[in-house]
């Protein structure tokens, strides 16, 4: 972690008394657009996360993907649905929704309930979902930076 994040002071916290399943953390660096050129730009995090979410949804992995801002939520949802259309599995589009500020409280409760009930496989959210909502049994929780 020191090498990845450039931090000198890193402390491992490995004891937690709360009951939970195993967790694994993965830091994902988007691939180069042109691997033959060392200084090449990288694939956009939105595009890369879209492919990851489609991969997870196809395998029925319950996922909440966090984005910093509303615009990222909207862009990512649009890309995921386009990718599902391209792969001719558009019916899975109904299994993923966004959750962000700007929605009415009633709409947010409907989305939460759909996730609790198992009607949704994925939510693309801002930190609006982090505040006071406990959705258990998630398989994955990527964060777009």
Question: Residue ranges of each PLM-predicted region?
Answer:
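Alpha-helical scaffold elements adjacent to nucleotide-binding pockets in ATP/GTP-utilizing enzyme cores
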Residues: 1-4, 75-83, 110-114, 137-140
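Conserved interdomain linker/interface between the two RecA-like ATPase lobes of SF2 helicase motors
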Residues: 2-73
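Conserved acidic residues
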Residues: 10, 121, 139
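Short hydrophobic/charged patches on amphipathic alpha-helices used for structural packing
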Residues: 50-54, 112, 130
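Short, surface-exposed connector motifs at secondary-structure boundaries
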Residues: 56-63, 92-95, 134-140
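Conserved helicase motor "Helicase C" RecA-like lobe of SF1/SF2 P-loop NTPases
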Residues: 70-93
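Conserved helicase ATPase core of P-loop NTP-dependent helicases/translocases
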Residues: 97-126
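A short beta-strand element within the Helicase C-terminal
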Residues: 124, 129-145
């Amino acid at each position: 972690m020191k090498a990845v994040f450039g931090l000198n002071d890193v402390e491992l916290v490995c004891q937690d008394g709360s009951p939970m399943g195993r967790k694994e953390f993965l830091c994902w660096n988007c691939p180069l657009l042109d691997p033959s050129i060392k200084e090449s730009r990288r694939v956009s995090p939105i595009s890369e996360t879209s492919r990851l979410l489609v991969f997870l949804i196809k395998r029925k992995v319950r996922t909440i993907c966090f984005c910093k801002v509303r615009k990222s939520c909207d862009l990512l949802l649009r890309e995921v649905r386009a990718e599902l259309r391209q792969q001719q599995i558009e019916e899975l589009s109904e299994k993923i929704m966004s959750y962000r500020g700007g929605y009415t409280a009633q709409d947010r409760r409907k989305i939460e309930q759909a996730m609790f009930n198992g009607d949704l496989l994925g939510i693309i959210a801002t930190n609006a979902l982090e505040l006071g909502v406990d959705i258990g049994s998630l398989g994955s929780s990527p964060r777009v930076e």
